[in-house]
Amino acid sequence: MIANERIKIRINQLEMMYPDSFHEMSEEKKAGLVFYKDSPGACLEDPEHHIIVTVGWTKPGIMAMMLNEKEAAKAAEKKISRPMAAHGYHLEEFSDTVLGGVKASGYRYHYHIQDTDMTGETLVVKYKKVFYYLNFYARTGLLEESFKIWHLILDTIVFEE
């Protein structure tokens, strides 16, 4: 399934581990990602399993500070749904979970790009006035195995002081 070795990464106060089959995505590949900006965080890929995971964080402005993780997830979904419509974007569901002992909200969706059916999931966590955005992208045909790997990563998340 996945390699036994795990690599630890810290993004602001979020710490997580990922399998050694992942590596930091090149700047050239990052530039091709529509919604990945130069925000602080990490952009990881596992070419063997065709998975991309991005993790970023932002300190929101005064108005956005009033949002909770569920409202921030809905705002993020609204932001991507219009431009992704050209790629057959379809929202599957909104959901809630817990990551590292902190409430998280997110959404799962499907789209089609470069002749490939894809599934994405975004999870939003608000921890100490900072929003963390965790994004997962995988080929829909490989989803069962990909979700196992994604959830192994999510299960390692802790928030440090």
Predicted regions and their residues:
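N-terminal targeting sequences that direct proteins away from the cytosol to non-cytosolic compartments
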Residues: 1-50, 58-67, 75-103, 110-118, ...
